[in-house]
C-alpha cells in the first residue's frame, strides 16, 4: 500500500475487494482498509481503450500463504492459473494506457521471480531496479508504443540549446 493520498483526485484506485479488517492487534495499530474508487478485476478493466496516461500495476504476488494469513488478507494472493491472470492483467493495463503512456509495475519476488513474471508479457520494461539491495521488491517502468507501433520520438541531443527541437526516431 504505497499511496501517499488515496483521496488524490488525480488517481483512480481499482481493486477487486472492498474490505476493512484488523490485521495488527497491537495497541494503536490502524485497521487495514481496502476501499477502491472502482471495484474491478485487473484482468478485465471496465475502461475504454487508451484511457490513462499512467497506470500503476501492483498485482498480488503471494502464492504460498494461507488464505487467512495477514499478508494474504492485506495484499491478496495468486490463485489458480495465476500466470494467465497476470498475463491478462498486463494486456489490460496496456489496453487502457494511452499511446506513449507509462506503466509502472511493482512486484515482490518472495514467491515468484520477477523474470518469470516479465516473461508473461511481450512488452519490455524501459527502466527498473535490477537487484534491490534491501528487499525483494522490483519497480519496472514500461512505455507504450505510439499508435503506429513505434517508440516515442526523441528530441535530438543539443537541439534545446539551439532553440531547435528537431525530433528523430
Question: What kind of region is each of these model predictions?
Answer:
Residues 1-169:
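Class I S-adenosyl-L-methionine-dependent methyltransferase catalytic core
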